[in-house]
Swiss-Prot record:
Pathway(s) served: Lipid metabolism; fatty acid biosynthesis
GO biological process: fatty acid biosynthetic process
Organism (species): Cyanidium caldarium (Red alga)
One GO MF term attached to the UniProt entry: acetyl-CoA carboxylase activity
Record protein name field: Biotin carboxyl carrier protein of acetyl-CoA carboxylase
Length: 152
Protein backbone atom coordinates (compact mmCIF):
# COMPACT_ATOMS: atom_id res chain seq x y z
CA UNK A 1 0.00 0.00 0.00
CA UNK A 2 2.85 2.39 0.78
CA UNK A 3 4.20 2.07 -2.74
CA UNK A 4 0.86 2.44 -4.56
CA UNK A 5 0.60 5.15 -7.19
CA UNK A 6 -2.44 6.71 -5.47
CA UNK A 7 -0.39 7.20 -2.31
CA UNK A 8 2.40 8.92 -4.27
CA UNK A 9 -0.05 11.10 -6.24
CA UNK A 10 -1.72 12.24 -3.00
CA UNK A 11 1.65 12.93 -1.38
CA UNK A 12 2.86 14.99 -4.36
CA UNK A 13 -0.44 16.93 -4.62
CA UNK A 14 -0.35 17.72 -0.90
CA UNK A 15 3.27 18.84 -1.13
CA UNK A 16 2.70 21.01 -4.22
CA UNK A 17 -0.40 22.73 -2.85
CA UNK A 18 0.91 23.31 0.68
CA UNK A 19 3.34 25.87 2.03
CA UNK A 20 6.02 23.26 2.62
CA UNK A 21 9.66 23.63 1.64
CA UNK A 22 10.95 20.19 2.62
CA UNK A 23 9.29 16.78 2.77
CA UNK A 24 10.87 13.59 3.99
CA UNK A 25 9.48 10.10 3.45
CA UNK A 26 11.10 7.41 5.60
CA UNK A 27 11.18 3.77 4.64
CA UNK A 28 12.75 0.89 6.53
CA UNK A 29 15.96 0.98 4.49
CA UNK A 30 15.95 4.42 2.86
CA UNK A 31 14.69 7.98 3.01
CA UNK A 32 13.43 10.31 0.28
CA UNK A 33 13.90 14.08 0.62
CA UNK A 34 11.88 16.47 -1.55
CA UNK A 35 12.67 20.20 -1.70
CA UNK A 36 10.89 23.17 -3.25
CA UNK A 37 10.80 26.92 -2.87
CA UNK A 38 8.57 28.16 -0.08
CA UNK A 39 5.30 29.59 -1.36
CA UNK A 40 4.27 33.13 -0.58
CA UNK A 41 0.84 33.15 1.10
CA UNK A 42 0.61 36.94 0.55
CA UNK A 43 1.27 36.98 -3.22
CA UNK A 44 -2.29 38.09 -4.09
CA UNK A 45 -2.62 40.54 -1.20
CA UNK A 46 -3.65 44.06 -2.24
CA UNK A 47 -2.21 46.95 -0.25
CA UNK A 48 -4.71 49.42 1.18
CA UNK A 49 -4.97 52.75 -0.72
CA UNK A 50 -3.04 54.72 1.93
CA UNK A 51 -0.15 52.23 1.82
CA UNK A 52 -0.05 52.33 -2.00
CA UNK A 53 0.20 56.15 -1.91
CA UNK A 54 2.90 55.99 0.74
CA UNK A 55 4.78 53.43 -1.33
CA UNK A 56 4.76 55.63 -4.46
CA UNK A 57 5.92 58.68 -2.45
CA UNK A 58 9.03 56.76 -1.39
CA UNK A 59 10.34 56.39 -4.96
CA UNK A 60 12.70 59.34 -4.48
CA UNK A 61 13.93 57.89 -1.17
CA UNK A 62 14.57 54.54 -2.88
CA UNK A 63 16.61 56.26 -5.61
CA UNK A 64 18.80 57.81 -2.92
CA UNK A 65 19.16 54.46 -1.14
CA UNK A 66 20.19 52.76 -4.39
CA UNK A 67 22.85 55.39 -4.90
CA UNK A 68 24.23 54.74 -1.40
CA UNK A 69 24.29 50.98 -2.02
CA UNK A 70 26.72 51.06 -4.96
CA UNK A 71 29.43 49.62 -2.72
CA UNK A 72 27.28 46.68 -1.55
CA UNK A 73 27.74 43.37 -3.35
CA UNK A 74 25.68 40.20 -3.23
CA UNK A 75 27.24 36.85 -2.39
CA UNK A 76 25.36 34.31 -4.54
CA UNK A 77 25.11 30.58 -4.03
CA UNK A 78 27.06 28.79 -6.78
CA UNK A 79 24.92 25.65 -6.34
CA UNK A 80 21.63 24.48 -4.87
CA UNK A 81 21.85 22.83 -1.47
CA UNK A 82 21.52 23.28 2.29
CA UNK A 83 22.97 26.51 3.77
CA UNK A 84 25.05 26.17 6.94
CA UNK A 85 26.34 29.21 8.82
CA UNK A 86 28.87 27.21 10.86
CA UNK A 87 31.20 24.24 10.45
CA UNK A 88 29.16 21.99 12.77
CA UNK A 89 25.96 22.16 14.85
CA UNK A 90 26.41 24.33 17.92
CA UNK A 91 29.59 26.00 16.62
CA UNK A 92 29.86 29.76 16.20
CA UNK A 93 28.83 31.01 12.75
CA UNK A 94 31.60 31.83 10.27
CA UNK A 95 30.33 35.43 10.05
CA UNK A 96 27.61 37.66 11.51
CA UNK A 97 26.17 41.03 10.52
CA UNK A 98 28.93 43.56 11.11
CA UNK A 99 31.79 41.04 10.76
CA UNK A 100 34.78 42.27 8.77
CA UNK A 101 35.73 39.73 6.10
CA UNK A 102 38.89 39.31 4.08
CA UNK A 103 39.53 37.76 0.69
CA UNK A 104 39.40 33.96 0.88
CA UNK A 105 37.62 33.89 4.26
CA UNK A 106 34.93 31.20 4.60
CA UNK A 107 31.47 32.78 4.81
CA UNK A 108 29.27 29.67 4.92
CA UNK A 109 28.91 26.09 3.70
CA UNK A 110 26.49 24.74 1.09
CA UNK A 111 25.87 21.00 1.33
CA UNK A 112 25.03 19.44 -2.01
CA UNK A 113 24.94 15.71 -2.70
CA UNK A 114 26.61 14.94 0.67
CA UNK A 115 29.52 17.27 -0.21
CA UNK A 116 30.31 20.29 1.97
CA UNK A 117 31.22 23.26 -0.26
CA UNK A 118 32.84 26.21 1.50
CA UNK A 119 31.76 29.58 0.12
CA UNK A 120 34.58 32.10 0.42
CA UNK A 121 34.66 35.87 0.15
CA UNK A 122 36.28 37.20 -2.99
CA UNK A 123 36.51 40.73 -1.58
CA UNK A 124 37.31 42.71 1.55
CA UNK A 125 34.45 44.33 3.43
CA UNK A 126 31.86 44.09 6.18
CA UNK A 127 28.79 41.81 6.33
CA UNK A 128 25.76 44.04 5.78
CA UNK A 129 23.02 41.38 5.69
CA UNK A 130 22.72 37.58 5.90
CA UNK A 131 19.81 36.54 3.67
CA UNK A 132 19.72 32.77 4.34
CA UNK A 133 19.10 30.99 7.63
CA UNK A 134 21.02 28.01 8.94
CA UNK A 135 19.50 24.82 7.51
CA UNK A 136 17.62 26.58 4.69
CA UNK A 137 17.54 25.05 1.21
CA UNK A 138 19.05 27.58 -1.19
CA UNK A 139 19.01 27.58 -4.97
CA UNK A 140 21.77 28.38 -7.44
CA UNK A 141 22.28 32.17 -7.74
CA UNK A 142 20.21 32.89 -4.61
CA UNK A 143 21.58 35.81 -2.55
CA UNK A 144 23.21 34.42 0.60
CA UNK A 145 24.74 37.60 2.01
CA UNK A 146 25.40 41.24 1.23
CA UNK A 147 28.83 42.75 1.83
CA UNK A 148 29.72 46.44 2.04
CA UNK A 149 32.99 46.74 0.14
CA UNK A 150 35.91 48.36 1.90
CA UNK A 151 36.74 51.75 0.40
CA UNK A 152 40.33 51.84 -0.84
Amino acid sequence: MLHSSIYWKNLINTFESGCFSIAEVKFIFSNIHIYKNICNPYKNYQLPELARNLQSSKKLDNAILKQDKKNIIDILSPISGIFYSSSKPGASPFVAVGSVVSKGQTLCIIEAMKTMNEIESDSIGKIHQICARNGDFVTKNQVLMKIILEQS
